[in-house]
């Protein structure tokens, strides 16, 4: 099983700390699916202010994590000359539900799957 570490992901995405949220990507099926891990730590940048007495990862950062995982999957599956000096954007989110809070000292597991593509839009 191929695993992309954070140092591999940095080569695929323009994001840097503290906004590089995904820690690794595995179960990679090029341009189709993968699993990403976000290690939510006590010292994560959002913990101090969201919310001081009951910290949770903001939903928008969970969605951002999905976008980063999808972008890394896409860049990993393409020939480098295809994506070099280009950005991959999340084009939409349908029916997002946050059923449980994501709290510090937990591992957020994201399963991503490409469900359709149209030209350069996935």
Regions found by a protein language model. Give the residues of each.
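Active-site helix/loop of acyl-thioester processing domains in fatty-acid/polyketide metabolism
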Residues: 25, 57-82
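Catalytic strand-loop segment that frames the active site of acyl-thioester-processing enzymes
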Residues: 17-57, 62
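Beta-strand-rich interaction surfaces with strong enrichment in secreted/lumenal proteins
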Residues: 10, 53, 98-100
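Short aromatic-glycine motifs in intrinsically disordered, low-complexity regions
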Residues: 4-16, 83-84
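Hydrophobic core residues within well-ordered beta-strands of beta-rich domains
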Residues: 19-21, 108-109, 122
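Hydrophobic beta-strand-centered segment that forms part of the acyl-chain substrate-binding groove
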Residues: 1-3, 70-111, 115
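Small/polar/charged residue-enriched interaction surfaces, especially the RNA/DNA-contacting tracks
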Residues: 3, 15, 37-39, 113
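Short, conserved beta-turn/loop elements at beta-strand boundaries and strand-helix junctions
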Residues: 29-32, 116-121
């Amino acid at each position: 099983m191929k695993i992309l570490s954070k140092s591999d992901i940095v080569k695929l995405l323009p994001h840097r700390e503290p906004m590089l949220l995904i820690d690794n990507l595995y179960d990679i099926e090029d341009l189709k699916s993968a699993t990403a891990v976000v290690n939510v730590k006590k010292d994560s940048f959002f913990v101090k202010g969201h919310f001081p007495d009951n910290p949770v990862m903001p939903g928008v950062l969970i969605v951002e994590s999905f976008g980063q995982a999808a972008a890394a999957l896409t860049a990993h599956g393409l020939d480098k000359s295809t994506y070099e000096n280009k950005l991959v954007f999340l084009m939409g989110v349908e029916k997002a539900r946050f059923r449980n809070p994501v709290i510090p000292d937990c591992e957020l597991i994201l399963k991503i799957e490409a469900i359709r593509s149209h030209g350069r839009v996935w």
